[in-house]
Amino acid sequence: MTEYLVPYANAESEFEEKRSRFISHVFLVESEAEARARIDEMKKKYYDARHNCWCFVLHDGTVRYGDDGEPQGTAGQPMLNVFQRENVENVVCIVTRYFGGILLGAGGLTRAYAKAAKDALDAAGKARMQPFSVLLLECPYPMFERIKLLIEGHEGRIESNDYGAAVTLTFLLPVQKTADFSAALTEISGGQMSAEEVEQRFLPGARE
């Protein structure tokens, strides 16, 4: 599985340029159908806007963009260039423009749409898709907080807790961190605790 960058989160950004209002959204998607559904969602939300321009880039190589009535090459392509330059995939970006009555010109539009896409990406952040181990660990209650901190310290995250005689934790850990985590767990538990890997998943990691 090859690592690649995706948006860390969905995000929104907004700015005004010569009385035109630009509202940009970035979403993490996994398919063209999902990307187009997000585009349709934003077009319905901002149905009264002059333009809802968009682009998306998928890990499978699919690349699409639309200018939605803006002069050709002044909206979707500059937006797309932002994500290709940043090497971000599995992303869809929609930029809504409410026209303010002042023409921006081709150069002004190109800069504005590129800025809108970059602002939304900066708000979303980036994460690297990477292999994660899904682990199970039975933890005595007095050790719970220490184990929680240990997981977080190794860039892991807890998926669920099952409270019984002890706490059974289901958590995710980057594969490259599992050996260090296991060694630290053995040390703090005096060799009494070990985590069991149940599967591996390919998921976004920490924000970069």
Where are these predicted regions, by residue range?
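Short amphipathic alpha-helix segments
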Residues: E138-G156
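Short amphipathic alpha-helices in soluble, non-transmembrane regions
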Residues: I147-E152, D180-S189
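Active-site beta-strand/loop microenvironment that shapes enzyme catalytic pockets
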Residues: M79-A123
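Positively charged, aromatic-enriched nucleic acid-contacting surfaces
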Residues: G61, P71-V88, Y163-A165
